[in-house]
């Protein structure tokens, strides 16, 4: 098979060269070596020798109307070079990008019923289930203080449940702990964690749930109610009053399913191998 030259068009918020030294899966093979195995020549920046291009969309705060966007849209529409579009933003934060996007050439974390699913890639880690009982019997929450999140945190605290909150921006609650400099290290100290997605629409699904599960937290997840994650079935809890109150009773089954998920091939939907395969296979 001939080499495929891919030009990754730089973005102001998301670029892939930092991934190349990371393990592509549990094998220890790096992303760079895996791309070589697949006969891929990856170029960062536009390149006249490239066979195809990869674009990454940016949100409303990052130059919707910019020279870079105009150039990218010109290339997509006028030039004949194949491309794929990656959108890591909620649809409500990237309206123009979604309006302009070709559904056949777009992978998205908020695909709705129009686009193809994109999973953010992350490294595998041991969830440490065997030492779970040694963790703090408290709930951890890492996220920005948005109004609906503050209301939920107050409701949890009003139930007499211990919850610690981490973020750069202060929360108007006494249990705000400051910034979590290492998300994984903080999470591994807690038995439970709340994950509240940035959007509850269009089947939005980020890396947040996997980040929690791979650290062995029993996770209460708030997302689009229509979102289905069959690979993760039984490995997390929906956020509701009953699940919070029964968390100790439910935790052993959740932990068992986390172990199955992380030690089987199911977790690989979040692997760098799967991420780059989806891009490459779009062109082959």
Predicted feature locations:
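Pol beta-like nucleotidyltransferase catalytic core
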Residues: 2-91, 95-169, 173-284
């Amino acid at each position: 098979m001939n080499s495929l030259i891919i030009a990754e068009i730089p973005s102001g918020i998301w670029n892939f060269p930092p991934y190349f030294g990371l393990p592509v899966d549990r094998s220890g093979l790096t992303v760079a070596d895996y791309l070589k195995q697949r006969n891929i020549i990856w170029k960062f920046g536009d390149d006249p020798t490239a066979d195809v291009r990869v674009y990454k969309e940016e949100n409303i705060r990052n130059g919707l109307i910019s020279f870079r966007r105009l150039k990218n849209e010109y290339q997509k529409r006028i030039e004949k070079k194949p491309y794929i579009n990656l959108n890591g933003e909620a649809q409500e934060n990237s309206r123009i990008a979604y309006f302009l996007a070709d559904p056949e050439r777009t992978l998205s974390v908020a695909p709705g019923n129009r686009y193809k699913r994109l999973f953010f890639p992350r490294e595998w880690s041991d969830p440490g289930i065997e030492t779970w009982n040694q963790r703090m019997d408290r709930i951890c929450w890492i996220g920005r203080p948005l109004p609906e999140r503050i209301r939920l945190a107050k409701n949890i605290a009003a139930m007499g449940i211990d919850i610690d909150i981490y973020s750069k921006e202060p929360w108007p609650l006494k249990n705000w702990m400051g910034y979590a400099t290492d998300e994984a290290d903080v999470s591994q100290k807690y038995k439970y964690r709340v994950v509240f997605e940035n959007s509850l629409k269009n089947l939005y699904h980020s890396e947040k749930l996997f980040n929690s599960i791979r650290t062995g937290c029993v996770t209460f997840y708030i997302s689009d109610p229509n979102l289905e994650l069959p690979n993760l079935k039984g490995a997390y809890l929906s956020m509701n009053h009953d699940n919070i109150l029964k968390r100790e009773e439910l935790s052993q089954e959740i932990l068992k399913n986390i172990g199955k998920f992380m030690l089987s091939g199911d977790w690989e939907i979040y692997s760098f191998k799967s991420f780059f395969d989806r891009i490459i296979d779009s062109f082959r």
